[in-house]
Amino acid sequence: CVLVLFLCTSGYFLFSEPKIATIQSCEDAAWESDLPTTPGSELIPGTLKLRTGLASIELRSGASFVLEGPAEVELISAMKTRLVAGMVMVEVPEQAIGFVLETPDGYAIDYGTRFAVAVDPIKNVSSFEVIDGEIGVHHPVSGSEVRLVDNQTISIEKGIVSPMKEG
């Protein structure tokens, strides 16, 4: 009986979802989410929908982001997040270089930086802006990658990559 109980509980710990992020703070936040949404909550992979306000989330990798509502983000792993809609400001320390932020239109690989991404699903546009540092923006349909550095922006609209602009 004790062995069965041990096997059942150890199986629970072996197969339970890993905690990949923590909500650091919220400001005037109103949520629609199955995941916990109070500051200090540890998060497993899943989707967060922020109707209004701001939320600061830190991933176990050390990467962190501020989500501005209305927004929807899917936490995939400590090194990968998907912005479905809305705006996010991302900060990636050295230990999290290689962090990936996906959007419906492309994705950014971080090389140690602060950057912002906005997704408008109605207009089918994803915009990327580097505040400080460097990212690579990838367009999966064409297979192209564009490197952005300080104050550069690029957008992908309806599958077309716009030229870089100085911000």
PLM features: residue spans?
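Flexible, surface-exposed loop/linker segments and immediately adjacent secondary-structure boundaries
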Residues: 2-47, 51-154
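Pro/Ala/Gly-rich low-complexity, hydrophilic intrinsically disordered segments
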Residues: 157-167
